[in-house]
Amino acid sequence: MGGAVVDEGPTGIKAPDGGWGWAVLFGCFIITGFSYAFPKAVSVFFKELMHEFGIGYSDTAWISSILLAMLYGTGPLCSMCVNRFGCRPVMLVGGLFASLGMVAASFCRSIIQIYLTTGVITGLGLALNFQPSLIMLNRYFNKRRPMANGLAAAGSPVFLCALSPLGQLLQDHYGWRGGFLILGGLLLNCCVCAALMRPLVAPQASGGAEPHGPQRPSPRLLDLSVFRDRGFLIYAVAASIMVLGLFVPPVFVVSYAKDMGVPDTKAAFLLTILGFIDIFARPTAGFITGLKKVRPYSVYLFSFAMFFNGFTDLTGSTASDYGGLVVFCIFFGISYGMVGALQFEVLMAIVGTQKFSSAIGLVLLLEAVAVLIGPPSGGKLLDATKVYKYVFILAGAEVLTSSLVLLLGNFFCIGKRKRPEVTKPEEVASEEEKLHKPPVDVRVDSREVEHFLKAEPEKNGEVVHTPETSV
């Protein structure tokens, strides 16, 4: 589903559901891939960073957490920038920031400097690309929006399949510094995607005249009215709890395998398996959600996806060998893909198109706090116990709790709300028949009108002059 991005085009623009929208979808696919896969892909460098700086699991986990926190927490800033400058310029600047952060990180001499470069600068750059790309996608698609969101969300697993082995390969050949430098160059592709975000323009009236219509009020940079929506509040609370555990398994599964004695390349392949399954899960979930009979119940489908994900984490905690982790990654990829494809589609279904830009930024801001807590808390638990099982149990419990909050909240607070009395279908049909019935032809006799006009004044003793007698 921050500060309200009110970067809306002129009134009367209909979403094309195709055309240049496919180019926008491709750009959103790339941006989503970098935004979500990058925080997980950098985890392949964690072991070498621990040896380089003499730090623990929780210290390296902060890199992914800060990246995700910037991606989520800068929602209001992205909103105001887009409202002021538009989607395309903001994304161009964001692409430069994302690249600059990784290039600068390759020269860092302490973990704090990596937090500032990879975490803050690159994270800000990805945020300035991610939110505007989603806004543009939802402007170009309406009827096909669930499918478009599912296809765009598939960018995350596709890039995860590519970036994780690539990161391991770069680390083996060039070390973590050379790997960061090359990844910084790859992030410049965000600028290419920004160029695809062509704004929608209202069609001109015949003769080149500007279309006449009501003037829109000046947009607000921060629209907090969405907090009066009960459905939005339930979604925001559930999503914040979900994020506490959602990103923990992908961050730790590679280290989990290495701790079992699995070779580094084979361990990194787990993320490729997860991503490969995720590639098919997201478009499939988007297609199913777009079905007429399913779309009204998308909130409950999203709740099921969260429950499935949390249950997978709990069962994954029992894995004792590489085969068990492979099975875990397969089912985690399915559930994770469902969550990724549905989260923003459900948010739009709850708040509507007009308030989506406000709602998404505010939700991302709320989730930022949870992102800062999730992976580091898992790292702290791992440092204290040295047992990966407890990390996966904690993550699963958090995601399961979020699914119950969303399900029960919508069922009891939304679905059970007292609805106004509905008129019977027969009465509705009768009323419509009366409304569409042609009026009775009432004829007026001019002589009766003349007689009435003469009679009224005579009652008061007045003299009446008709047009004929006045000549």
Swiss-Prot record:
<feature type="region of interest" description="Basolateral sorting signal">
    <location>
        <begin position="447"/>
        <end position="471"/>
    </location>
</feature>
<dbReference type="GO" id="GO:0015650">
    <property type="term" value="F:lactate:proton symporter activity"/>
</dbReference>
<keyword id="KW-0769">Symport</keyword>
<keyword id="KW-1133">Transmembrane helix</keyword>
<keyword id="KW-0597">Phosphoprotein</keyword>
<dbReference type="GO" id="GO:0016324">
    <property type="term" value="C:apical plasma membrane"/>
</dbReference>
<feature type="topological domain" description="Extracellular">
    <location>
        <begin position="253"/>
        <end position="267"/>
    </location>
</feature>
<feature type="transmembrane region" description="Helical">
    <location>
        <begin position="299"/>
        <end position="319"/>
    </location>
</feature>
<feature type="transmembrane region" description="Helical">
    <location>
        <begin position="268"/>
        <end position="288"/>
    </location>
</feature>
<feature type="transmembrane region" description="Helical">
    <location>
        <begin position="356"/>
        <end position="376"/>
    </location>
</feature>
<dbReference type="InterPro" id="IPR050327">
    <property type="entry name" value="Proton-linked_MCT"/>
</dbReference>
<feature type="transmembrane region" description="Helical">
    <location>
        <begin position="150"/>
        <end position="170"/>
    </location>
</feature>
<feature type="topological domain" description="Cytoplasmic">
    <location>
        <begin position="201"/>
        <end position="231"/>
    </location>
</feature>
<dbReference type="GO" id="GO:0016328">
    <property type="term" value="C:lateral plasma membrane"/>
</dbReference>
<feature type="transmembrane region" description="Helical">
    <location>
        <begin position="110"/>
        <end position="130"/>
    </location>
</feature>
<dbReference type="GO" id="GO:0015129">
    <property type="term" value="F:lactate transmembrane transporter activity"/>
</dbReference>
<feature type="modified residue" description="Phosphoserine">
    <location>
        <position position="430"/>
    </location>
</feature>
<dbReference type="InterPro" id="IPR036259">
    <property type="entry name" value="MFS_trans_sf"/>
</dbReference>
<feature type="transmembrane region" description="Helical">
    <location>
        <begin position="322"/>
        <end position="342"/>
    </location>
</feature>
<feature type="transmembrane region" description="Helical">
    <location>
        <begin position="62"/>
        <end position="82"/>
    </location>
</feature>
<keyword id="KW-1003">Cell membrane</keyword>
<feature type="transmembrane region" description="Helical">
    <location>
        <begin position="232"/>
        <end position="252"/>
    </location>
</feature>
<dbReference type="GO" id="GO:0031965">
    <property type="term" value="C:nuclear membrane"/>
</dbReference>
<feature type="transmembrane region" description="Helical">
    <location>
        <begin position="85"/>
        <end position="105"/>
    </location>
</feature>
<dbReference type="Pfam" id="PF07690">
    <property type="entry name" value="MFS_1"/>
</dbReference>
<keyword id="KW-0812">Transmembrane</keyword>
<feature type="topological domain" description="Cytoplasmic">
    <location>
        <begin position="1"/>
        <end position="17"/>
    </location>
</feature>
<feature type="topological domain" description="Extracellular">
    <location>
        <begin position="377"/>
        <end position="391"/>
    </location>
</feature>
<feature type="topological domain" description="Extracellular">
    <location>
        <begin position="320"/>
        <end position="321"/>
    </location>
</feature>
<comment type="function">
    <text>Proton-dependent transporter of monocarboxylates such as L-lactate and pyruvate. Plays a predominant role in the L-lactate efflux from highly glycolytic cells.</text>
</comment>
<dbReference type="GO" id="GO:0005886">
    <property type="term" value="C:plasma membrane"/>
</dbReference>
<comment type="subunit">
    <text>Interacts with BSG; interaction mediates SLC16A3 targeting to the plasma membrane.</text>
</comment>
<feature type="topological domain" description="Cytoplasmic">
    <location>
        <begin position="131"/>
        <end position="149"/>
    </location>
</feature>
<feature type="topological domain" description="Extracellular">
    <location>
        <begin position="171"/>
        <end position="179"/>
    </location>
</feature>
<dbReference type="GO" id="GO:0035873">
    <property type="term" value="P:lactate transmembrane transport"/>
</dbReference>
<feature type="modified residue" description="Phosphoserine">
    <location>
        <position position="470"/>
    </location>
</feature>
<dbReference type="GO" id="GO:0042867">
    <property type="term" value="P:pyruvate catabolic process"/>
</dbReference>
<comment type="similarity">
    <text>Belongs to the major facilitator superfamily. Monocarboxylate porter (TC 2.A.1.13) family.</text>
</comment>
<feature type="topological domain" description="Cytoplasmic">
    <location>
        <begin position="413"/>
        <end position="471"/>
    </location>
</feature>
<feature type="transmembrane region" description="Helical">
    <location>
        <begin position="392"/>
        <end position="412"/>
    </location>
</feature>
<dbReference type="GO" id="GO:0050833">
    <property type="term" value="F:pyruvate transmembrane transporter activity"/>
</dbReference>
<dbReference type="InterPro" id="IPR011701">
    <property type="entry name" value="MFS"/>
</dbReference>
